[in-house]
């Protein structure tokens, strides 16, 4: 189309904008005729072709479903592995914590037994000294009388 084929007519002027009307002139016979776009003609499909297409579609659906099931199985397997690993780590942590606690309790028990033994030894020493002092006093008292 040329610029002469279009005419612009102003309709209204407003604060929000302007309105125009475009007038297109009829196409001239000199210009190349417009090629009308037509859709390709559909050919008749036979019953066999339709059946083949349906079978192919069914096969695609089955393959797609099998792929989805495979992905789900892989996802479940991964989840099982992750869960198993978490359980294993938890068990290892529990064992380590139990061993640590047992070691700590044994150390505390040994220290307590050592403290008790030391106190008993001090008490025996005091008892010896008291006994020596008592014997010493008993020996001195008869001579004083």
UniProtKB/Swiss-Prot annotation:
GO biological process, one term: neuron projection development
Phosphoserine modification, residue list: 16, 25, 39
Post-translational modification: Different phosphorylated forms, from unphosphorylated to highly phosphorylated, are found in the mature egg. Progressive dephosphorylation from the mid-blastula to the tailbud stage.
Domain SLD residue range list: 4-145
GO cellular component, one term: neuron projection
Domain of life: Eukaryota
Ranges in coiled-coil conformation: 40-135
Keyword field: Coiled coil, Cytoplasm, Cytoskeleton, Microtubule, Phosphoprotein
Main location class: cytoplasm
Tissue expression per record: Ubiquitous. Mostly abundant in brain and oocytes.
Gene Ontology MF: a single term: tubulin binding
Localisation per UniProt entry: Cytoplasm, Cytoskeleton
A Pfam family the protein falls into: Stathmin
Protein task: Involved in the regulation of the microtubule (MT) filament system by destabilizing microtubules. It prevents assembly and promotes disassembly of microtubules.
Subunit field text: Binds to two alpha/beta-tubulin heterodimers.
PANTHER family: STATHMIN (PTHR10104:SF5)
Family note: Belongs to the stathmin family.
Name listed for the protein in its UniProt record: Stathmin-1-A
Biological source species: Xenopus laevis
Organism taxonomic ancestry: Eukaryota, Metazoa, Chordata, Craniata, Vertebrata
